[in-house]
């Protein structure tokens, strides 16, 4: 039986790029955003360049820092509100 093994590197890189774009659009430096989400700047920087496999708790911190849901952070789709 062969198990499907996914190379997470492209996913990590894509997620990091999304974080970098959102942070830049929000006008934060890496240091400012890392402070906002209570994360070390160098650790956050390594997420942006795709060197970190982000834990669920850090995923929550990042989504909260951008004032969005995890789903919106991961897909780029925001929920409509009335």
Describe the function of each predicted region.
Residues 20, 31, 60:
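Residues within the helices of the helix-turn-helix
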Residues 2-24:
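A short, Lys/Arg-rich alpha-helix, primarily the initiator
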Residues 57-72:
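DNA major-groove recognition helix of helix-turn-helix/homeodomain DNA-binding modules
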Residues 24, 35, 64:
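Alpha-helical residues within the helix-turn-helix
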Residues 17, 27-28, 54-57:
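Residue-level signal for the short linker/turn that defines the boundary of a DNA-recognition helix
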